[in-house]
Amino acid sequence: MLNEFKAFIAKGNVMDLAVGVIIGGAFGGIVKSLVDDIIMPIVGAIFGGFDFSNYFLGLSSAVNAPTLAGARAQGAVLAYGSFITVLINFLILAWIIFLMVKGVNTLRAQVERKDNKVAEAAPPPADVQLLTEIRDLLAKR
């Protein structure tokens, strides 16, 4: 059983998945920083300097804090500003992944077209040509 587990872990697919998860986690941090530190301040400057992170709706009358952290300490809140930020993170990440997949698919299609052209352009072997000529001559008789 232990040997089977070792063989399973050593498979390329499992290792590729592990690397993908680790890189994906790091990439998620980069996208979060891009949104939080670059995009959201620009959006805030365009729309009058507001900060999405402190946009919330208190679900009880006891919630009256000016910040999300304070409001959460006072009671339940709908933190729609945080949701907007996470949604923007997701859209950016999805767009980047879409562009990457599209690029890979384009490269694959180009390689396949090139392989097909090479296969079509290659002349048949000499013995096949000879047999084809013999067949054509016999067909004319």
From Swiss-Prot:
GO terms for molecular function: mechanosensitive monoatomic ion channel activity. The keyword Cell membrane applies. It is a multi-pass membrane protein. One of its GO terms (cellular component) is plasma membrane. The keyword Nucleus does not apply. The chain crosses the membrane at residues 14-34, 38-58, 81-101. It is found in: Cell inner membrane. Keywords: Cell inner membrane, Cell membrane, Ion channel, Ion transport, Membrane, Transmembrane, Transmembrane helix, Transport. Its main location: membrane. It comes from the Bacteria. Homopentamer. Channel that opens in response to stretch forces in the membrane lipid bilayer. May participate in the regulation of osmotic pressure changes within the cell. Belongs to the MscL family. This is Large-conductance mechanosensitive channel. It comes from Rhizobium rhizogenes (strain K84 / ATCC BAA-868) (Agrobacterium radiobacter). The lineage of its organism: Bacteria, Pseudomonadati, Pseudomonadota, Alphaproteobacteria, Hyphomicrobiales.
